[in-house]
Amino acid sequence: MAWAEINGIRMFYESHGEGEAIVFAHGAGGNHLSWWQQVPFFREKYRCITFDHRGFGQTVEPEGGPGANAFSTDLAALLDHLGIERTFLVAQSMGGGTCMGFTAAWPERVRGLVMADTMLAMEEDGLASRMKALRDKQTQPFTLQGRAYAPILKEKRPDMAFLYDSVMALNPPRTQPTGDRDPRFVATTEKLAKWTVPTLFIAGDLDVIFPPDILEYASTLIPGAQFAKVPDCGHSVYFEDAEAFNRIVNEFIAGCA
């Protein structure tokens, strides 16, 4: 356990293992603890970095702070603090905005990008229209509650569902970002067409937040991007089927060598 005084905050992070770095960026339903099924697997060959985004876990967001609009610069500052020049990025949901935004601004620092259950920070007309159509069909306000994982998890593994909810409950109340997203951290249509960073999208076939057809479409916007769909999983493949998730990510990273 360690702390980094960076970017106006005191960021909590952990580092496990040695070798090439993999940074894991959690989603809105988690924090650094979310990756408990990934770190023991990947630390045998890689240096695994987990952290709490500002406003999550043990990283406090200053009053009136920029919130999510600072996530990508926070990541850059953390890497600088750790002396990591290039890294693999594994992003879950909200963490996709962090990592896609970081890659859009500093592609030379990314060995490979995994976008799990997310397409955040990507801006393209077809993607936007698909997401709008999805939200227009929803009859209730959009929330993470009850949608973070597939109902089948609570039926078959109530212990795992309870653990997920308990990890999420450790986070303080969320704050809304202030200001506008820096355009440097937006993967525009033009940037996506020229994308050179190896990229993998992973989707749960039961995800109702970012359904697999939308993520598969997102993968077509990046030259050479890969797409994997995992059965019987909702919005948290890394948690619901860690064995499949770890295997898919491990094969992708090995292929980037």
Regions found by a protein language model. Name each.
Residues 1-22, 44-47, 85, 186, ...:
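Alpha/beta-hydrolase fold catalytic core
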Residues 40-43, 49-94, 247:
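Active-site loop/oxyanion-hole signature of alpha/beta-hydrolase fold enzymes
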Residues 100-105, 110-140:
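Flexible "cap/lid" loop of the alpha/beta hydrolase fold
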Residues 124-125, 140-194:
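Conserved alpha/beta-hydrolase catalytic His-Asp/Glu region
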Residues 195, 201-203:
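Short beta-strand/loop motif that positions the catalytic acidic residue
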Residues 206-210:
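Acidic catalytic loop of the alpha/beta-hydrolase fold
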Residues 225-257:
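Catalytic active-site module of serine/aspartate enzymes centered on a nucleophile-bearing elbow/loop
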